[in-house]
Amino acid sequence: MRRKISNNPDDYIEPLYMNGLHGRMLRIPGPPRKKREILLVYGHHSSLERLFGLAQDISRYGTVTMPDLPGFGGMEPFYKLGEKPSLDNLADYLAAFVKLKYKRRRVTIMGMSMGFLVATRMLQRYPELAKKVDILVSVVGFVHRDDFKFKKRNYLLMRYGSSFFSNFLPAWIAKTFVLRAPLIRLTYRSVADRHSKMRDADKNELKRRIDFEIVLWKCNDIRTYMDTTVSMLTADLCKERVDLPVYHIAVPGDRYFDNKIVEQHLNVIYSKAEVIVSKVSAHAPTIIATAEDIEPFVPPKIRRMLAKA
């Protein structure tokens, strides 16, 4: 019988102060006899609440810890320190968290999309941390700009549009006049029938998803969002090796990534890359997915690995 876990993420969230920045951290204790420590790193346009369902689900295998990333989930951005949210800075931040939180303990790392990109860069910059990792899981992650399968026109529009809005004045204008709840709601409603996050939702579910999208757009720093978009679209981590095997959860028909190319790049970086296809076809679970909704997303093989002592 599965133990009872609160469905309120606030019951597991605590303050976090790292590298001069205030944020939050989610920690769900595992079952008494499970000693595994799992570090969950969320991706782009995310928060602790967005991945709470996944954290709930995998906490059956051990204690799950998920920190905010600077500029995401309401955490103060690197700009407060006069720094940019570069991939290296994010990797350094994550390394500091791992060293502080886990010290000499072993850790399982699961990185979601951009979160896996950050985790990979951390392991490249801090190879000593790779020795602490017992299992490394990429959850629809990527490591190179060519992993994306956007059309060239769309790629260039996102690449240079994001670069423009990562500057202070354009970002301020967007935050002040564009990212307003009524306008966000109107935009999502107008494209709901063809938007991948919305089209399968009924009226009540659609409202819940849009309301949560509004929260995400409000709690994520717009400059950080845009600057990290540029980092993702220009990434190339294939120049340094990591002495670890990686298990990559892929989804069939991923609308963002070419799974074959992702696998090739993972094999360039890691000692071994094994692709395990999820039963779920979406790039990520819905933004309000519960632990029960998440369950089909994590393949049985990954579950068996996590279940081992």
Predicted regions and their residues:
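Alpha/beta-hydrolase fold catalytic core
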Residues: M1-I38, S59-G62, Y102, A289, ...
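Conserved loop-alpha-helix segment in the C-terminal half of the alpha/beta-hydrolase fold
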Residues: Q56-D57, P245-S281
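Flexible "cap/lid" loop of the alpha/beta hydrolase fold
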Residues: A130-A171
